[in-house]
Regions:
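Cytoplasmic helix-loop-helix junction between adjacent transmembrane helices
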Residues: 104-141
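C-terminal membrane-cytosol helix-exit motif in multi-pass small-molecule transporters
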Residues: 170-189
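Hydrophobic core of transmembrane alpha-helices in multi-pass small-molecule transporters
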Residues: 19, 88, 99-112
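Pair of pore-lining "gating" transmembrane helices in MFS-fold secondary transporters
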Residues: 7-32, 210-227
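Short amphipathic helix-loop junctions that connect adjacent transmembrane helices
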Residues: 30-44, 231-246
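Conserved MFS/SLC helix-loop-helix module at the cytosolic interface between two early adjacent transmembrane helices
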Residues: 60-96
């Protein structure tokens, strides 16, 4: 039946959605620091804000999106997140100043559906295949990183930075279509409708000493990754005098 077929495809569809979103983000990382001629008011501070705006809104809204998906359904919140991601990509594609680019990146990040997608994956997969489904998501993110580091410099060199955001918006639209075609709202969702209980649970997560090591490790990993790919392209092109066309090969 269609429903059983869709259920089998859910892990693959969620992996594609993760991959599409991350591809659009990874393509930007190695080239944004080199776009000083593309945007007005470009400086080191505005560059850092533009890169960090996505993660800032993503981090703030991740838990609210998860709570709302418990109350209003996974599919609705995934739609909302992908629409925001697509709108943010369009805003960034049309940006001519760093302020506009920062706004676009912040809107992109406000579609904080990573947790909701993983919750949907847990809702629709049995315990036997759940680990494999999670591994599939990780594999697609890894492929997106590889492609993003390669395609980003190539697209920017030949077509311009705005084409990356246009491609990202297109991937957002494709993701919306995939959700409509293959994702059904799960019948059973683990819900906690008492807001005060939810807030207490969230507070305990922040102060859990065992989890704090994971929080710190993930924070340091992302900090070093973003810093590395922010500085390395500038070093390669300015200090070592490599052309931007060499960046895909080096990365």
């Amino acid at each position: 039946s269609r429903k059983s077929m869709n259920k089998k495809l859910v892990p693959l569809v969620i992996s594609f959605i993760f991959g599409f979103r991350m591809l659009g983000l990874f393509m930007i990382i190695p080239v944004l620091a080199l776009q000083d001629d593309s945007y007005s008011n470009f400086n080191s501070f505005s560059l850092g804000i533009a890169l960090g705006a996505y993660g800032f809104t993503q981090g703030i809204l991740q838990i609210p999106f998860g709570i709302m998906s418990d109350k209003f359904g996974r599919k609705r919140l995934i739609y909302l997140g992908l629409v925001l991601f697509t709108i943010g990509s369009i805003v960034a594609a049309t940006a001519v100043s760093m302020e506009q680019l920062i706004l676009g990146r912040a809107i992109q990040g406000s579609g904080a559906i990573s947790g909701t997608l993983l919750a949907l994956l847990a809702d629709t997969t049995g315990e036997r295949i759940r680990s494999s489904a999670m591994a599939l998501v990780g594999m697609f993110i890894g492929i997106a990183f590889l492609l993003g580091m390669t395609l980003g410099p190539l697209i920017t060199e030949f077509y311009g930075m705005n084409r990356i955001f246009e491609l990202t918006a297109s991937l957002g639209i494709i993701s919306i279509l995939l959700v409509g075609a293959f994702i059904d709202e799960p019948k059973s969702i683990t819900k906690n409708l008492e807001l005060d209980i939810e807030l207490t649970s969230i507070k305990s997560l922040f102060f859990d000493t065992k989890l704090s090591h994971l929080y710190l490790s993930i924070f340091m990993l992302h900090l070093s990754l973003m810093s590395f790919f922010l500085i390395l392209p500038v070093m390669l092109t300015e200090d070592l005098e490599h052309s931007q066309q060499m960046l895909p090969i080096i990365f």
